[in-house]
C-alpha cells in the first residue's frame, strides 16, 4: 500500500499558493515539498518587452536585492528597454531641431 502524505502547512486546499511535489527524504519517507511561485519578468513600460539583465523574482525577493542587481547602467535602466530609450532620445533631439528651425524661420520672417 502506498504511503499517505499530508500537507505540511495549515492551508488544506489545492490552490496556486499551495502547490507541492512529492519527494523522498534520505530517511526513505515520502513527503510533500512546497513549491514557490515563479517570479514574473520585469517588462518595458513603453514597448512591453522583457527587460534584459534584471532577474525574474517574487516581489519580496526583489525588494531584498541590492540596487545594482535591480537596474542596468543606462538612463531609465530597469524601467525601459534599450530600444525605447534610444527612440526617446532620437525623438527629443528631433523635437529640439524642429524648435530651432521654427525659431530661425520666425526670425527670418520678422527681418523682412
Swiss-Prot record:
Compartments, as annotated in UniProt: Cytoplasm
KW Ribosomal protein (keyword) present: yes
Annotated GO biological process: cytoplasmic translation; ribosome biogenesis
The keyword Ribosomal protein appears for this protein: yes
Keywords for the protein's UniProt record, in alphabetical order: Cytoplasm, Ribonucleoprotein, Ribosomal protein
GO CC terms in record: cytosol; cytosolic large ribosomal subunit; preribosome
A GO MF label: structural constituent of ribosome
Free-text function comment from the UniProt entry: Component of the ribosome, a large ribonucleoprotein complex responsible for the synthesis of proteins in the cell. The small ribosomal subunit (SSU) binds messenger RNAs (mRNAs) and translates the encoded message by selecting cognate aminoacyl-transfer RNA (tRNA) molecules. The large subunit (LSU) contains the ribosomal catalytic site termed the peptidyl transferase center (PTC), which catalyzes the formation of peptide bonds, thereby polymerizing the amino acids delivered by tRNAs into a polypeptide chain.
Miscellaneous field: There are 2 genes for eL34 in S.pombe.
Subunit description: Component of the large ribosomal subunit (LSU). Mature yeast ribosomes consist of a small (40S) and a large (60S) subunit. The 40S small subunit contains 1 molecule of ribosomal RNA (18S rRNA) and at least 33 different proteins. The large 60S subunit contains 3 rRNA molecules (25S, 5.8S and 5S rRNA) and at least 46 different proteins.
Similarity comment text for this entry: Belongs to the eukaryotic ribosomal protein eL34 family.
Protein name: Large ribosomal subunit protein eL34A
Organism of provenance: Schizosaccharomyces pombe (strain 972 / ATCC 24843) (Fission yeast)
Gene (UniProt): rpl3401
